[in-house]
Amino acid sequence: MSLLLEPSKEQIKEEKLYQQMGVSDDEFALIESIIGRLPNYTEIGIFSVMWSEHCSYKNSKPVLRKFPTSGERVLQGPGEGAGIVDIGDNQAVVFKIESHNHPSAIEPYQGAATGVGGIIRDVFSMGARPIAVLNSLRFGELTSPRVKYLFEEVVAGIAGYGNCIGIPTVGGEVQFDASYEGNPLVNAMCVGLIDHKDIKKGQAKGVGNTVMYVGAKTGRDGIHGATFASEEMSDSSEEKRSAVQVGDPFMEKLLLEACLEVIQCDALVGIQDMGAAGLTSSSAEMASKAGSGIEMNLDLIPQRETGMTAYEMMLSESQERMLLVIERGREQEIVDIFDKYDLEAVSVGHVTDDKMLRLRHNGEVVCELPVDALAEEAPVYHKPSAEPAYYREFQETEAPAPEVKDATETLFALLQQPTIASKEWVYDQYDYMVRTNTVVAPGSDAGVLRIRGTKKALAMTTDCNARYLYLDPEEGGKIAVAEAARNIVCSGAEPLAVTDNLNFGNPEKPEIFWQIEKAADGISEACNVLSTPVIGGNVSLYNESNGTAIYPTPVIGMVGLIEDTAHITTQHFKQAGDLVYVIGETKPEFAGSELQKMTEGRIYGKAPQIDLDIELSRQKALLDAIKKGFVQSAHDVSEGGLGVAIAESVMTTENLGANVTVEGEAALLFSESQSRFVVSVKKEHQAAFEAAVADAVHIGEVTADGLLAIQNQDGQQLVHAQTKELERAWKGAIPCLLKSKA
């Protein structure tokens, strides 16, 4: 029971207690001006979460406006729970990515689990059935005991929630770098399927309509979670463990099915997840979007704990809760549906016409605030921006090729780097086949799910090489989008749209804000050229630990459409005798590469460059060749360069090998030049494929001897290794590191 006396309005101002909630002096003065009086404790708490970066994007809005958000297929862009893209036949795909970085740093299992739960609710609140989950994870070096603990617990949290709720986790990425040592990144993406007629919005329309609370009871977990997510991590962050929510996937499964049934009922007017800022954000945002107000009686809120105050109820981020607006007089229809699932559905208020959020508790009005001020009128900051000194130095430094004395040894070593190594240890914990629609499981360039009753399928991926962004955020931003699109194309799909998760450090530092601006410029340019609009996403700033920022990490989630399941393609070579091609030229580009990090222990120099027009041309040519049936396998060349891409392609259930000839010195095998693919083609399609893909160069063929042999044009042997030995090293690296005591 809460025994604390809340401070008075005067105390809040005089003692500047609002600063503890992340509200600045100027913001407090603005709040006072907007409402024409001093706010009470509940009201300043509500303003603090709604005006946090996590909810308001007050530091990032000027940057987000750069993104293209419309397109022929876009049915819903940014502004709702998730974006929606048309895929024909009156069907649409719904998807969104969200972060749960700060909670995962201090309570990794629950932090990751509730991140999955929250993004699933965002998707089904739009009326869609979630069909897949992906995740993009970043950790410090896997030699650290603390990092091993975080890694194991985060993966267990994702598996524990996703497996229980029955949604397959079909893909994602895991990368390791010292910059994430104290601040791991846990980004979760959910993809759903919907018929056009079932699309719902989070709007509180219709004066007098009933506001209903459904799902789990409200507790004290997660209070100020949104504020916690809007500040730097420090040694004292452990004290904020109560700001981490606790999830119940079985409750979420019931809530999902009940909500999807309610969506078929025309009594439903609007629906929204109680995510960041809980009851506060869902009520204020739904009213603001509809141009209405909401009045609620907090005495009616289902509570898990006794003696909860209005402040605690409004700021709680207890999981598995939704807010619904129902036609007046039809409440019992909704109650009956939720009763079937043994869930509470309680009328707690109604829609008004005065654009106010009015809350009653214990017979008193404890809050009366304008909804637009909460949801739309947070101050927007144009932060100072300054190019960091290291950037100019890197731009003027062509990173030399690291010395490669033995390319076979180097290939083995690269395949065992945790960022490149097989993530089988991770995805074997996920149920990626549940619901039996998964056609391409984790481990290829993208996850692929069929759409039952049609010939269509969806490909999905997440991508970002943060090292490139550290060296050059604009070029790195372009590359992140391009690599995601390459992965989609390699699966036989046309890239449709993007959801982005902008993970950066403290925007109040000019060098960090410069990174954000430049990365957004690069992402925007790539999305325009590749025709992949940004339909939603998330911003996670203040990712710093004791003053040290993470690498800039704008994760790109992308979905593509496969028109015919016959076009589905994977990265693995299929049969001996097929011809091996590389599309795109290899340049001596080693800055930010896995080879540079491994051999020199740091990254520096001018980042790899990308020509987006060439990228688009190659993607279109390859996709056309795939659709015509010329391509047996396709794999994009990324971390570790051509050598790693060929090795990954040759690791199949058959004991295949490859004999290829490449140009140049051994180190070039591991250059990370952009816009490249490794492709295999049947001999009978050689002429047609070469005519279709002008940039393709024939470098060898798939063999049946289980041997990877790579030589240069001078006849010098570069790599000579048994495929199964390479695969054993690649698959064993992460389990081996986790078992070691170091």
Swiss-Prot record:
It comes from the Bacteria. CDD domains: PurL_repeat1, PurL_repeat2. Mg(2+) 1 binds at residues 98, 538. Substrate binds at residues 99-102, 121, 245, 317-319, 540. Pathway: Purine metabolism; IMP biosynthesis via de novo pathway; 5-amino-1-(5-phospho-D-ribosyl)imidazole from N(2)-formyl-N(1)-(5-phospho-D-ribosyl)glycinamide: step 1/2. It holds the Pfam family AIRS. GO terms for cellular component: cytoplasm. It is an enzyme of class 6 (ligase). Its main location: cytoplasm. ATP binds at residues 57, 96, 500, 537. The keyword Zinc does not apply. One of its GO terms (biological process) is 'de novo' IMP biosynthetic process. GO terms for molecular function: ATP binding; magnesium ion binding; phosphoribosylformylglycinamidine synthase activity. The keyword Magnesium applies. Keywords: ATP-binding, Cytoplasm, Ligase, Magnesium, Metal-binding, Nucleotide-binding, Purine biosynthesis. Part of the phosphoribosylformylglycinamidine synthase complex involved in the purines biosynthetic pathway. Catalyzes the ATP-dependent conversion of formylglycinamide ribonucleotide (FGAR) and glutamine to yield formylglycinamidine ribonucleotide (FGAM) and glutamate. The FGAM synthase complex is composed of three subunits. PurQ produces an ammonia molecule by converting glutamine to glutamate. PurL transfers the ammonia molecule to FGAR to form FGAM in an ATP-dependent manner. NCBIfam families: FGAM_synth_II, PRK01213.1. Belongs to the FGAMS family. Monomer. Part of the FGAM synthase complex composed of 1 PurL, 1 PurQ and 2 PurS subunits. This is Phosphoribosylformylglycinamidine synthase subunit PurL. It comes from Bacillus velezensis (strain DSM 23117 / BGSC 10A6 / LMG 26770 / FZB42) (Bacillus amyloliquefaciens subsp. plantarum).
